[in-house]
Structure formats: C-alpha cells, structure tokens
Swiss-Prot record:
<dbReference type="InterPro" id="IPR020070">
    <property type="entry name" value="Ribosomal_bL9_N"/>
</dbReference>
<keyword id="KW-0687">Ribonucleoprotein</keyword>
<dbReference type="GO" id="GO:0019843">
    <property type="term" value="F:rRNA binding"/>
</dbReference>
<dbReference type="InterPro" id="IPR000244">
    <property type="entry name" value="Ribosomal_bL9"/>
</dbReference>
<dbReference type="InterPro" id="IPR020069">
    <property type="entry name" value="Ribosomal_bL9_C"/>
</dbReference>
<keyword id="KW-0694">RNA-binding</keyword>
<protein>
    <recommendedName>
        <fullName>Large ribosomal subunit protein bL9</fullName>
    </recommendedName>
</protein>
<keyword id="KW-0689">Ribosomal protein</keyword>
<dbReference type="InterPro" id="IPR036935">
    <property type="entry name" value="Ribosomal_bL9_N_sf"/>
</dbReference>
<dbReference type="InterPro" id="IPR020594">
    <property type="entry name" value="Ribosomal_bL9_bac/chp"/>
</dbReference>
<comment type="function">
    <text>Binds to the 23S rRNA.</text>
</comment>
<dbReference type="GO" id="GO:1990904">
    <property type="term" value="C:ribonucleoprotein complex"/>
</dbReference>
<dbReference type="GO" id="GO:0006412">
    <property type="term" value="P:translation"/>
</dbReference>
<dbReference type="Pfam" id="PF01281">
    <property type="entry name" value="Ribosomal_L9_N"/>
</dbReference>
<dbReference type="InterPro" id="IPR009027">
    <property type="entry name" value="Ribosomal_bL9/RNase_H1_N"/>
</dbReference>
<dbReference type="GO" id="GO:0003735">
    <property type="term" value="F:structural constituent of ribosome"/>
</dbReference>
<keyword id="KW-0699">rRNA-binding</keyword>
C-alpha cells in the first residue's frame, strides 16, 4: 500500500515522503496512529495544503526533543535495587525503572525511549544507556545501579 508520511519515521522516511509498506502495517499502525495517510489524489492535495503546518509542528517537536537531550546528555541517574553480597541484583533494573528515575530528576521520559540493547541490568555498577527522545535526538546517560539499604 502506498502512503504519505505525516511525520518522520525511522527506517521509512521523512515528512511528505510517499512510501510503499505492507497493508497490515499501514492499516493497523501508521494510519490509526496519525503517522500516515493513504496516497490518494485527494489526500495528496490535502497534504500539500497542510504541508507548512505539519513541517512547523515537526520542527517544534524536534526542538523540544533537542532541549531535553541537552538536559539529559552526560547526566548520571541512580537506581537503588536489592542486591546480594556478590553484587548481583535480586530482580533487575528495566527501562521502566530508568525512565522513572529520569522523571524523578525532572525530565520528561517514557520507558519506550530508554534503550537497553543487552537487556535489563542485573548487577551493581555503572552503565551507559541511550535515551531516544526523537529519531534525531538521542541522549547518552550513565545509570548507576547501587545496592539498596536494608
């Protein structure tokens, strides 16, 4: 199915691109989420009429993400978790725990933005973690996992 992208989508394209995707991806995700429209003549004309408005909205979203990225870059976030004598955690530190610690520090973040390529953190220590605030704004933070006081 051919669609018009209404925002930048990683791996697909930029605002205004006409791309071909699988029918299910378009019908079940992109179109209901407001990220795309079918590439019909009427929708193409409507998009061209709204192009400046959509570009301004995307620029505003990117500027907000860049501002949050500058606040986050280089920050150290501490997460306390119960741990054994050998430094291994009882349980693990997930992206939800890290997002909650970032929010507690006063910066907006959701768990879907926190990238843990090697899975949840399972030991005490410091870890480099990426927080993807936008496809063009990725902040690198340090997560310090410490043993919680009994």
């Amino acid at each position: 199915m051919q669609i018009i992208l209404l925002e930048k989508i990683g791996g697909l394209g930029n605002l205004g691109d006409i791309v071909t995707v699988k029918n299910g991806y378009a019908r079940n995700f992109l179109i209901p989420a407001g990220k795309a429209k079918r590439a019909t003549e009427a929708n193409m004309k409507e998009f061209e009429a709204r192009r400046a408005e959509l570009e301004a909205k995307q620029a505003e979203i990117l500027a907000d993400a860049r501002a949050r990225q500058e606040k986050l870059d280089g920050q150290t976030v501490t997460v306390a978790q119960k741990a054994g004598v050998d430094g291994r955690l009882f349980g693990s530190v997930t992206n939800a725990d890290i997002a909650a610690a970032i929010v507690a520090a006063g910066i907006e973040a959701v768990k879907a933005n926190v990238r843990l390529p090697n899975g949840p953190l399972k030991a005490v220590g410091e870890y480099e973690v990426e927080v993807a605030l936008h496809t063009d704004a990725v902040a690198k933070i340090t997560v310090a996992v410490i043993a919680a006081a009994e």
